[in-house]
Amino acid sequence: GQMYRISTICIAFMLCTFNSAYSQELTIHPGQLWLDNNGKHINAHGGNIINADGHGDWDGETRSEDGGPMPGVSAYKSDDLVNWTNCGLVLEVLDQPGHTLERGCVIERPKVVYNKKTGKYVMIFHHELKDKGYDAAMAGFAISDTPEGPFRYIRSLRPHAGVWPADWTEVDINAAKALKMEDYKEWWTPEWTEAVKKGLLLNRDFDGGQMSRDMTVYIDDDGKAYHIFSSEDNLTLHIAELTDDFLDYTGKYVRMAPAGHNEAPAVMKRNGKYWMITSGCTGWAPNEARMFWADSILGPWTQAPTPFKGDKVDTSFDSQSTYILELPNGQFIFMADRWQPWQLALSPHIWLPM
């Protein structure tokens, strides 16, 4: 979709940090260039920040400044969440023809999480293969001893080949199995939408595994990790339980908001309730964010009004959610990207207090 340049909304806010030794007041100016220790805009998009030994570690997509193939994922490190040091590429694409990580592939929305059981850092990302557009729709996995990498690439796959959702009955499964793509050639009709809700696309991809595009990873209080991703041609979110090492799926997953067309999920938990912010699907162009809540990460989820207030609600302040950062003082920061398709490397970061 087309994106229009519009004037930046200046929202400056104070930040409490992971490290109590830093008590000076710090201000963030969303939407402006955010310079690292080398004086360059932080080139880590669609990523997340974790608290690693009292400092912030920010991993995200590194886009090429000249519009060429992306080089991979970079990490940045900070003691105050405002001044960031570039640690360089932590997962690099490869100059190996035929390799799934071959230069020209696309890595989007990388999320790095710490696994307390194994002591390893795990990166999960949306992976598209070289010269295949957005057809691959795979989930990629990599592992490291430190959040600053280097990450060792493990594999990419489509989740849940041969597995139906955990909450489906025999009746649900048989209804989905009866749905054939050739009976629904025209998209967006009421009949088609109803068929998607019942599992038309889930059944189509059943043998080879489900599509995995925009995504996040959420670790619950009990240490269980969940991979939450746009599936079924971006029409339905899947919430999938990961194995104890975070490197595979247990096979337990549920669908959320079938045929709802949600992307860019970001999750938080407050006072025992789970909250998810998503965006609609309009390519690189921004749209109004949506919010859902649940008493359990596996649902059921209920849609709530948009969380945004103010002038730019219909485009979520011209941004798309990437992560919700919880600070030690219980404050939450909504992290988002204001995508600039003409120069993705310089896409501004939008941080808003929640």
Write out the residue ranges for each language-model feature.
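Bacterial Sec-dependent N-terminal signal peptides
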Residues: 1-24
